[in-house]
C-alpha cells in the first residue's frame, strides 16, 4: 500500500469527481489516476531510473502530478522552494543527493551551480503524455517517498524522509480526528513546499476529496474561493488566518480550519471566531520529525484556549525531567512522543528511537492536555533562570497594537543572556513593558526592544528565529 493506491478505486467509483482544481485548470479522478500512472511509468522507463526526484515548481497541478508519480514509481520526491537562492538550491540538492530536478525554464538560473541533471517541465510532459498507464509494481510501505527540509527556524536546515506507512497513518488522523472525507472540498492556499500544505493536498487525494489549489496565498483570493466554491476545509497557518480574520464578508456555511497552531495565541483564535462565527477550528501541534502529536477540537479550543490539545488517537506522549523520569501534571519537562507517524530519520542520520523528542518543552494538565513552553535549544538562560521566548511572544501578540513579535536571547556580560523583543506594529517600548508587567514575572520581561518593518519567515510561515538573532547581533541598535 502507498499514498497513491486509492486513486484507482476512486476513479472507478467516482470517475467524474474533480480531483484537483486550480485557478486555470482541473482534472477528474479518472484522468488523475491515469496521469499519475503515466508519470510513474515515465520515471521508471528512464535509462537510469532516478531514486530521488527534486521538484522545483510553483503551486500547480503539475507539482502534485510529479510528486504523486514519483511516489507511485517508488522514488523519493524532494520539493525545492522557488524562493530559495541559487546557493540555497545547490545546498539542498547536494544534501538530498537528488538524481534529477524537474523545473520550468524560468527557474533554471537557480540551478546553474548545481551538478544535478535538469529536466524542463514542458519536455517531460510531452514524454509523459505518450507513456503507458500500465499497472505499477508493489512498493514497500516502509520505503521513503518524501524528503523535506526542516524549516531552519533555529539553525541550519536538515533533510528528513517520510515513508508511505507514516503518511498513511497520518491519513487516519485526518479521517478520524479531523473528520475529513471524500465529500470535502479542501482549499490549499499555501506553498506546497511546506509539508503542512503538501500534506493537506495529498491526504485529500488519498481520501477521494477535491483539492482546490491557489498559486500563492492572498486573503482576497482565498475569500473568493471560499465564497464561490463551497469550500468545506481550509488548511492554514496562524499568520494566514490572522490575515483572513481582517477581511469581511466570509460565507455563512461552516468551514473547518486545519491549522498548525501550537504557537497560535488564544487571543488570535478569539478574533478569528468573532470575525467568522461559522468556522470549526482544529489546530494541532506537530513537527517534521514527529508528524501529528496533539490537536484541539473546536470544543477544546473554547474550553482550553491556551492548550496545544490532546494526543491524536494513535499517539502517546510523556513529559520527562532531566533525569529521564516522568513528570507530574503541571511540571515542565521535555516532550517525548511514541507514534507510528514518526519520520524515517535524517539523511545520513541514525534510525529514530521508538520514543522520540525534538527537545520541545511543556507540561500536561490533569486531563492530559498538552501545553507547550518552548524549545530547549531556544531557551534563554537569564542569570540562571530559564525563559522560553514563546511564552513572551504569546503575551506580546495578545496586545492589540502588536502585529507580530519575535523574542530571542542575546549574549550579555552580566546576565549571560537577555531577552530581546522584535516588534511589528504601532506599540512603543513603554506600552509593551507595562503590558508585560501585568502578565509576566519581572525577569521574563524583555530587557531590550527593537521595532521593525518586517520579520523573516521560514517556508512554512514561521518566524525564522535564527535569522532574527543573527540580524540583531550584527546590525541593530536597541531601544
Curated annotation (Swiss-Prot):
Class of the enzyme per the UniProt entry, highest EC level: ligase
Keyword flag Transmembrane: no
Keywords: ATP-binding, Ligase, Nucleotide-binding
UniProt keyword Ligase, yes or no: yes
Upregulation: Repressed by presence of biotin, under control of BirA. Probably part of the bioY-yhfST operon.
Binding site for ATP: 150-158, 360, 375, 462
Pfam families xrefs: AMP-binding (PF00501), AMP-binding_C (PF13193)
EC number from the UniProt entry: 6.2.1.-
Entries under NCBIfam families matching the protein: PRK07638.1
Its biological purpose: May be involved in fatty acid metabolism.
Protein family according to the UniProt entry: Belongs to the ATP-dependent AMP-binding enzyme family.
Protein name: Uncharacterized acyl--CoA ligase YhfT
Organism of provenance: Bacillus subtilis (strain 168)
Higher taxonomy: Bacteria, Bacillati, Bacillota, Bacilli, Bacillales
